[in-house]
Every structure is written in structure tokens, then in C-alpha cells.
Amino acid sequence: MKYILIVIMVSFAMCISTACSGLGNKTKKEDNKGMDTAFCWEALVASSRNYPMEVHYARVGVGNSGGYVGVMERFTGSGLGEADGTVDMGSDSNGGMGAPSSVDIVWLSYLEKKFYRLNVKFSLELQDKIRQKFRTKYYDWPAKRYWAFTGFVINMLPKGHVWLYVDGIGRRELVCDTLVGREVNVPLQDFDEDGYRYRKTLDAFCEGRLRDYTWAEENFKRNGLSDGLWDTYKTKFNYEIEFKFEDEKAVLDVDYLYRFLTGEFWHRDNKPMPS
């Protein structure tokens, strides 16, 4: 009887040890996940629909590696945060790379007929904010699954302003709205050799490009460039949106988007809303 009791006690102790070991490994794994420093992402460019821009070059620094990814797309104008193209994907052998840490971009604002450059190393606070966004999964109710942000969007605005977004399936979030580039001189021949050959001057080149954006030119003639426009756009309010349906039995399903003037959007991440 004593022998049986000893065996039971030893077996019980081994079970506790194994369980604790497994819990420790799980906790360690989850902690490491929360400290991920390599992510799968791509760098993108965008601008407001009414203010089309053209990129000369754009590079995004990768973590503390000293490396960068270069944006291949030149033309923008689909909307705030609406990326028009993709990049030379720069993942390492493990399928990921460090989070964005800097931006060096030169672009042409057609309506202003000016070149701007933003060359900035992100603050540690901004780098950490971007890393946290890449680490955090968000739930997509219609798809019933989690997604991660996989896009880093450089959005150019008039007068050299730049907003930065993280972008994913069904969601886009503004992470920085305080960056401002400086006006620079770029010879048209260096920017676009064919454009220089046929247009000769920057004014003529921009006027030619704007033929593809007639609505933007019309808007510019009516409204010009408002100094306070983007400050108004980025102001956020703590709205609680309520829907009232004519049909009291109507139900608003989860498969719809919230879209904001900032260019942010996301799927409703909750259960269906009854009227």
C-alpha cells in the first residue's frame, strides 16, 4: 500500500512538472511573439485624389539594418492612403524584415509645380508605434479570421506635408501626420528625360501631366491650396454613430466599412447591429 502511494505521488509530481514546463514554454513563445521585430510588409506611395503627385524616388529604411526598400511606383492620386502600386519586396531569409525606421522621398507636386524632399529618421516613439501596429492582429468578422498590417503607405500632400499609414486587408490606420518636407530643385532632365525633350520646362511638363487629372485642376482653380485643410482633415472626434432604419426589423450586417476623411477605414469588428 505504501509502495502504491509513493508511485502515485511521484507520478503526480511528474505531471505537475510537465504541465508547468509546457506552460512556461507557451508563455515564452507568446512573449516572444509580442516582441517580434521582423515582419512581412511592403512600402507604398499615395496622395489625395485632388492633388496628384509623381515620385522621383522613395526609400524606406528597414529597422536598424542600414538597408532599405525602394518604391517602384511613380504615380499617385487615388485618394488619401490609397496606394497605387507595390515595391521590390525586401524580406529576409526568415520571411520578414525590420519595421520602417526612416523615409527618403523626392516628389513633384503637379499643381504647385514644385519638387519636395522628405529625408527623416523616425523617432523611437514612432518606430515603436509602427512595430506595435505590425504585431497586433485585427479581427475581420465577415472573413472570420485575423489579419496583420502588411503595408506602409507614404502619403504626399500639398506644401510638402506627408502622412504615414499602416495598411492591411479591410483596415488602414494613420500613424503620423506631422512630417513636412522641404522644397528642392530637381532638373527636369534628371526627373524625366523624355518629358524634358518634349516639354522643355517644368511648367509645361506639369500642365501636360494634369490633362489626365482634369478634376484636380478644376478643384485647384476653385479652392487653391488651403493652409488649414489638412489640419481639419486630421482632427478626430469621438463619435458614436447610430443608425435608424425605416424598417424596424432591419439588421445592419457586419460586412461594411467605416471610412474617414483622414483616409482611414476599417470593417465593423462587432456582431450584426439590430435596428
Feature-to-residue mapping (PLM):
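Bacterial signal peptide processing site
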Residues: S21-L23
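Compositionally biased low-complexity segments at domain edges in trafficked proteins
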Residues: I130-T232
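C-terminal motif of bacterial Sec signal peptides marking the signal peptidase cleavage site
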Residues: I16-A19
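Tryptophan-paired
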Residues: A58-S109, D253-S275
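Short beta-strand edge segments in extracellular beta-sheet folds
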Residues: N119-Q127
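Short acidic/polar inter-strand loop motif in beta-rich domains
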Residues: L108-R117
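Positively charged n-region of N-terminal signal peptides that target proteins for export
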Residues: M1-L5
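Long, low-hydrophobicity ectodomains and other hydrophilic envelope-associated domains
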Residues: K200, A204-S275
